[in-house]
């Protein structure tokens, strides 16, 4: 807890001490928030009766085993798959992708296209995961793809839309408030998160900004302001969001049903390329309909992602599941709740 005013924030937050019978449950839905909360031990500053739980905010974690097995199937067909490095460690039904041939790690969607352009004889797929910021980058990339029309490049999309999942969690889980993702909101805008029925605050990522956001949420909860929505990250987020990025997304992508780890199939929660761009849609080029996958029944990552289970309560945590040898996605990705809890747990 190496930041100023920690004791001041403890005092301010303690004004909203709650009895066990009136537990206040706040969910953070951003992997960067999860990491910061664990790093700075912010949970230790919360008053009695207030619980901060992690939600489905890690983009790599929420992609299920089926997505990994689709990548593996493409590799078996001699396709080169470009992907973000975190995906290498996410377990599928047949284990992780570590050691597989024809994989290329990229750091942006643009890197994937550049590889394809430099290797015109190589069938290249970009295994795409992420929320609105990465989706916006991919949409900008598609403008270049539309112009150049490379015949060896396609996108296997598992881009996610967070709102349908938040709506589901707000209906089914006993949540008192949401710490909303600043990076996503920089694209979608504040207004994208209206109508959830519980208080929400868009937050930045510094510890004091997170604590201030939590203070706003607790104050709103005690005042009964269920529809409160506050932008506490005004340097990066506007009410209308990034209009240019939204237009690009709408031009190239459309939402459809998508599978989320721990939540199953959620309507309108996965973005895929629109029909006019089917020539660059991996699932329209290659037959992946027969690919099947099973999640590891011992891994409880799905419960962690939906706030039903704290990482330390999983029987695999820290024993057979560690960052060096992860049994599940939440431990494999640095943005995962389990990985953050393990790295910054007491004694480490």
Task: Provide a role label for each language-model segment.
Residues 105-107, 159-163, 182-188:
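A general structural motif
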Residues 137-142, 245:
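Pore-lining transmembrane helices
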Residues 1-121, 135, 143-147, 154-156, ...:
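Metallocofactor- and cofactor-centric catalytic cores in central/energy metabolism, strongly enriched
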Residues 212-303:
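Internal helical hairpin/lid segments
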Residues 156, 170-236:
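A conserved active-site cap/scaffold subdomain adjacent to cofactor or substrate pockets
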Residues 159-167, 241-244:
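Short, conserved secondary-structure transition motifs
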């Amino acid at each position: 807890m190496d930041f100023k005013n920690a004791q001041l924030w403890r005092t301010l937050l303690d004004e909203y001490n709650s009895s066990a019978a009136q537990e206040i449950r706040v969910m953070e839905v951003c992997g960067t928030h999860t990491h910061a909360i664990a790093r700075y031990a912010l949970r230790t500053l919360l008053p009695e009766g207030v619980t901060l739980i992690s939600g489905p905010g890690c983009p790599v974690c929420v992609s299920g085993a089926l997505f990994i097995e689709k990548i593996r199937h493409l590799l078996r067909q001699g396709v080169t798959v470009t992907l973000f490095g975190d995906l290498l460690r996410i377990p599928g039904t047949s284990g992780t992708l570590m050691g597989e041939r024809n994989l290329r790690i990229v750091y942006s969607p643009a890197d994937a296209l550049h590889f394809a352009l430099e290797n015109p004889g190589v069938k290249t797929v970009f295994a795409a995961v992420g929320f609105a910021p990465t989706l916006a980058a991919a949409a900008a990339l598609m403008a270049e793809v539309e112009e150049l029309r490379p015949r060896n490049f396609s996108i296997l999309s598992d881009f996610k839309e967070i709102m349908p999942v938040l709506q589901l969690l707000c209906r089914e889980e006993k949540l008192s408030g949401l710490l909303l993702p600043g990076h996503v909101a920089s694209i979608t805008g504040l207004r994208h998160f209206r109508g959830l029925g519980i208080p929400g605050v868009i937050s930045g990522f510094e510890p004091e900004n997170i604590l201030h956001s939590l203070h706003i949420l607790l104050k709103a909860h005690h005042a009964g302001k269920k529809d409160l929505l506050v932008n506490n990250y005004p340097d990066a987020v506007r009410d209308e969001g990034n209009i240019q990025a939204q237009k690009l997304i709408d031009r190239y992508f459309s939402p459809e049903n998508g599978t989320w780890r721990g939540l199953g199939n959620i309507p309108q929660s996965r973005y895929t390329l629109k029909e006019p761009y089917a020539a660059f849609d991996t699932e329209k080029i290659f037959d992946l309909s027969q690919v099947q996958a099973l999640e590891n029944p011992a891994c409880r990552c799905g419960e962690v992602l939906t706030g039903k289970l704290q990482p330390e309560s999983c029987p695999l945590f820290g024993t057979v599941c560690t960052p060096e040898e992860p049994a599940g996605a939440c431990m494999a990705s640095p943005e995962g709740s389990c990985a953050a809890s393990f790295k910054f747990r007491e004694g480490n």
